[in-house]
């Protein structure tokens, strides 16, 4: 057991170093998946030996560690082929090479520079969904990687590889789930493709040219970016503004005694780890009866990254916080977020301030400040 524990500690320490480095080199991300593969092997062996815990680390069932190991092998081998291609020297982030991104439509392709496409079903602004169209999609065919551009038309999101047009999201299928009239509008930046009575085969595509291309498109430029058929009407809409304001309330305050109050106001830049500014102390006159006195920090990021970071907190900074939760996720029918969450609690705000001043949070983990009622704990 001691040998496995030492190897597991070294493996997780290397993982955390890779997360903190936040490299743009593909070979570093290959090393990341090698570490995850080795971690799965160690946990699998520990379970075979009858161990349920290694220190604070819970040993998963054999089927879980085996599945995780297979996933790590797949990602490692795939990235190794990408490294050998002409795209291996491009900048790649940890998010670009994550398992979640690999399985995001179009599945088993790498993607970069996502652009938001808003679709209004039944042409109703209250019945809209956001989708991601990728500027660049990396497709593996037979023995080589090909880089293609993501496209948008009235029918859906697609890319063209060779002479094959592949839709990875069709709006008609989505309209059957979310709409009633099988009509919809596609909003791309400042351009709106209005819904015709039926989908015409002459609908022309919109190419996602770059991260800021839509926000700066003028009326003249938009007319060349979107080509409309006779059955399709194109109009210019004002630039969409991002909705801002408090996040949705968690549960019903009248029916629960455990309330999490996490602020969701102006977000600072990445140099400050995306801290969301907490206006609690600037609004002392308001009612905070549901946010009784227990300060929290809510961490968000990759599940494995959070587990390694939590392990380091228990090892080196256990006096700077009170409790640390297990990793958890928000569940909702339309929630596409893949990030995990960990909640840390503190004795008082001073301890939380000491924690934030002392502990270096990896750039791949964002955090928010808030308060929690612990009446149920």
UniProtKB/Swiss-Prot annotation:
It is found in: Host nucleus. It comes from the Viruses. GO terms for molecular function: DNA binding; DNA-binding transcription factor activity; nucleotide binding. Keywords: Activator, DNA replication, DNA-binding, Early protein, Host nucleus, Phosphoprotein, Repressor, Transcription, Transcription regulation. Its main location: host cell. Residues 293-377 are annotated as: DNA-binding domain. One of its GO terms (cellular component) is host cell nucleus. Pfam families: PPV_E2_C (PF00511), PPV_E2_N (PF00508). Phosphorylated. Transmembrane segments: none annotated. InterPro entries: E2/EBNA1_C_sf (IPR035975), Nucleotide-bd_a/b_plait_sf (IPR012677), Papillomavirus_E2_C (IPR000427), PPV_E2_N (IPR001866), Reg_prot_E2 (IPR033668), Regulatory_protein_E2_N (IPR036050), Regulatory_protein_E2_N_1 (IPR042503), Regulatory_protein_E2_N_2 (IPR042504). SUPFAM superfamilies: E2 regulatory, transactivation domain, Viral DNA-binding domain. Residues 1-200 are annotated as: Transactivation domain. Disulfide bonds: none annotated. One of its GO terms (biological process) is regulation of DNA replication. HAMAP family: PPV_E2. Belongs to the papillomaviridae E2 protein family. Binds DNA as homodimer. Interacts with protein E1; this interaction greatly increases E1 DNA-binding activity. Interacts with protein L1; this interaction enhances E2-dependent replication and transcription activation. Interacts with protein L2; this interaction inhibits E2 transcriptional activity but not DNA replication function E2. Interacts with protein E7; this interaction inhibits E7 oncogenic activity. Interacts with host TAF1; this interaction modulates E2-dependent transcriptional regulation. Interacts with host BRD4; this interaction mediates E2 transcriptional activation function. Plays a role in the initiation of viral DNA replication. A dimer of E2 interacts with a dimer of E1 in order to improve specificity of E1 DNA binding activity. Once the complex recognizes and binds DNA at specific sites, the E2 dimer is removed from DNA. E2 also regulates viral transcription through binding to the E2RE response element (5'-ACCNNNNNNGGT-3') present in multiple copies in the regulatory regions of the viral genome. Activates or represses transcription depending on E2RE's position with regards to proximal promoter elements including the TATA-box. This is Regulatory protein E2. It comes from Human papillomavirus 13. The lineage of its organism: Viruses, Monodnaviria, Shotokuvirae, Cossaviricota, Papovaviricetes. The gene is E2.
């Amino acid at each position: 057991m001691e040998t496995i524990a030492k190897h597991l500690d070294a493996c997780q320490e290397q993982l955390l170093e890779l997360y903190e480095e936040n490299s743009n080199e593909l070979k570093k991300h290959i090393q990341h998946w090698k570490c995850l593969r080795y971690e799965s092997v160690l946990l699998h062996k520990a379970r075979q030996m009858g161990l349920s815990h290694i220190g604070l680390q819970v040993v998963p069932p054999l089927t879980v560690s085996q599945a995780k190991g297979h996933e790590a092998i797949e990602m490692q081998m795939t990235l190794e082929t990408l490294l050998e291609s002409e795209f291996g020297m491009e900048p790649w982030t940890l998010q670009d090479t994550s398992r979640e991104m690999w399985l995001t439509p179009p599945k088993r392709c790498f993607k970069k520079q996502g652009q938001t496409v808003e679709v209004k079903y039944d042409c109703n602004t209250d019945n809209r969904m956001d989708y991601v169209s990728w500027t660049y999609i990396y497709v593996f065919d037979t023995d080589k990687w090909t880089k293609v551009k993501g496209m948008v038309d009235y029918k859906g999101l697609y890319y063209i590889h060779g002479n094959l047009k592949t839709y990875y999201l069709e709006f008609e299928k989505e309209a059957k789930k979310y709409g009633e009239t099988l009509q919809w509008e596609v909003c791309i930046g400042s351009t709106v493709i209005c819904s015709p009575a039926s989908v015409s085969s002459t609908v022309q595509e919109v190419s996602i040219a770059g991260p800021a291309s839509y926000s700066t498109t003028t009326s003249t430029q938009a007319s060349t970016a979107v080509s409309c058929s006779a059955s399709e009407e194109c109009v210019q809409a004002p630039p969409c503004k991002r909705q801002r304001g408090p996040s949705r309330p968690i549960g019903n305050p009248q029916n629960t005694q455990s309330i999490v109050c996490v602020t969701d106001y102006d977000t600072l830049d990445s140099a400050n780890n995306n801290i969301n500014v907490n206006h609690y102390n600037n609004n002392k006159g308001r009612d905070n009866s549901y946010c009784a006195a227990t300060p929290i920090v809510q961490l968000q990021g990759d599940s494995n990254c959070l587990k390694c970071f939590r392990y380091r907190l228990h090892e080196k900074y256990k006096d700077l916080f009170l409790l640390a939760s297990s990793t958890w996720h928000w569940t909702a029918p339309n929630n596409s977020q893949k990030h995990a969450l960990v909640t840390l609690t503190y004795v008082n705000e001073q301890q939380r301030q000491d924690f934030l001043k002392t502990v270096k949070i990896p750039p791949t983990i964002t955090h928010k400040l808030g308060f929690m009622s612990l009446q149920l704990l």
